[in-house]
Amino acid sequence: MAEDFVIEMLHITKEFPGIKANDDITLQLRKGEVHALLGENGAGKSTLMSVLFGLYQPEAGQIRKNGKEVAIRNPNDANALGIGMVHQHFKLVECFSVLDNIILGVEPNKMGFLQKAEARKKVMALSEKYGLRVDPDALISDISVGMQQRVEILKMLYRDNEILIFDEPTAVLTPQEIDELMEIMRGFKKEGKSILFITHKLNEIMAVADRCTVLRKGKYMGTVDIKDTTKEELSRMMVGRDVQLQVDKKPADPGRVVLDVENVTMHSAQHKKDAVRNVSFQVHAGEIVCLAGIEGNGQTEFVYGLTGLEKISSGKITLDGKDITNESIRQRSKDGMSHIPEDRHKHGLVLDYSLENNMVLQRYWQPEFQKGGFIRSDKVREYSDKLIAQYDVRSGQGSLTTVRSMSGGNQQKAIIAREIDKDPKLLVAVQPTRGLDVGAIEYIHRQIVAERDKGTAVLLVSLELDEVMNLSDRILVMYEGEIVGEFDPHTTTVQELGLYMAGARKQGKESK
């Protein structure tokens, strides 16, 4: 019956140029349940939730709350109905404090004067009640990603929202923060709050959700009770075929040393200390070496130094026998280094460029793409079309698609196509599957293993311990800017890695 559901989205259709993002989708949310929304990137999950939150207006369909039809024209309407949303990319003002961000738009006032003490009291009470401890006076720019997510959750609670939407909430969190978030969700459920949980991680769905609705290519595939299903069945519903959840790869056959890092140190001006300290290791042709660790332990700074985004303070980096320590990014690329960056929006793509222009960002100066100083658009499109077909990059208007309009998974596929097609000697893959669904993850893992099998040296940087254990031939753990241990994935455990990642243990001697 209709009164069983706190929210009903009935026959929702939402279109964008060249694509039907939601095609006659129905979703029904019960009071006090955690309802997961699962689907490949581009399946329409975030679009559907954006309709519920008033960011988009549907072409067809209706939304009901407690059985009554409602109009949600904007996020203010959604908040008035008790609907809140934590977006995958947080909507925070970096130069504002935590407190100012939480109360922004709903500041309490009396006779036109801001009642900040009253707001602080309410925020701290919510913080204490739900275990979401924050420093109300800290600037957003100075706090961790995990802490920023707490601020987003407190924004919803401050507005007395009872229907909470989480869009890929664990995509940017460490394993410890993920466990913490799962507990917070369970606490919300006990209080009778209803949660819509967009995720691509099947383990999380099985751990915290009561039911799951699956979308595929904008269409409704069904809703299942979690207690009656399996990860394999959910994967099949999501991608329309059996998905290999384990990486199938033969033992590595390492060859020559391709990357040799010697005593690299990088100083952080922001934190006034060394972010990377005396790091040394090698990566051979035909092997995948993973740099594992909790976020914020020097991995990002090290990759910046390795790829030329920042200068190292001391040490030496050699690529296939050539000293590249002081080379430019372009020269490192010419020497055979490819880079799949951690932040695809910041360092991987120009979002307002077309897909074809993004495909040649690192090659447009080559003779095949220009003549007399002018870009040969026909050759650029021909090359882009080839990569789109070869790597199954899906977009509304093919090579002419503006990259900003593409799903995260397809943006990542475009970067991987561009970087692998350079036939590199060294592939630096940083969080290559962050925020992606199982279908895209399976695809990307296959591509990385195929590169290794071709004889490419692969340096993988990942926070995902399942990915680390499945893909790596060797694992290096980084803690506070140092390599504290080297492991064989066949003889170690996630628990052992966790101790080294947390700084509880350290091997006496680093090995190459």
Spans of model-derived segments:
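Glycine-rich phosphate-binding loops of nucleotide-dependent enzymes
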Residues: 2-512
